[in-house]
């Protein structure tokens, strides 16, 4: 139950954050006392489990029923969503594939000719959208930590990471690959 509620709340927050326009404050609704108590109970359970939840917002009919900012969460700052992004990004790729906008067999480098390193390895050249989706892009370790705090151009940084294994050969959890999928969908 708690996991389901968390997923629902995280999904609502993510969907709301997809619109980058700032149209001012969202309208507010009135939550029932029962709903507010349930949310307070949920947040207490999250805290008791030492989970690092930064923010939560629940909307109904376009109105905010519940909103809380904790830890690193701030209402006026962009927030890294980490693994929540994987579900929505892969869904966006699925829609793009079903609409014929891309194929899972498209080469990753074909989307970013302006961001390629001076020398493109055979493994990087062989990397496809499918490899990003299945986290088998050829990296031996997750390169995500190389970029998100220090680099401005994540696409160039990803493409510059050595692809030491043949794509499709080895699984490596790779959040950076999810970013690349989002960059491909945006193209």
Predicted features by range, described:
Residues 19-23:
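Bacterial lipoprotein signal-peptidase II cleavage site
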Residues 43-73:
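A short, well-structured edge-of-sheet supersecondary motif
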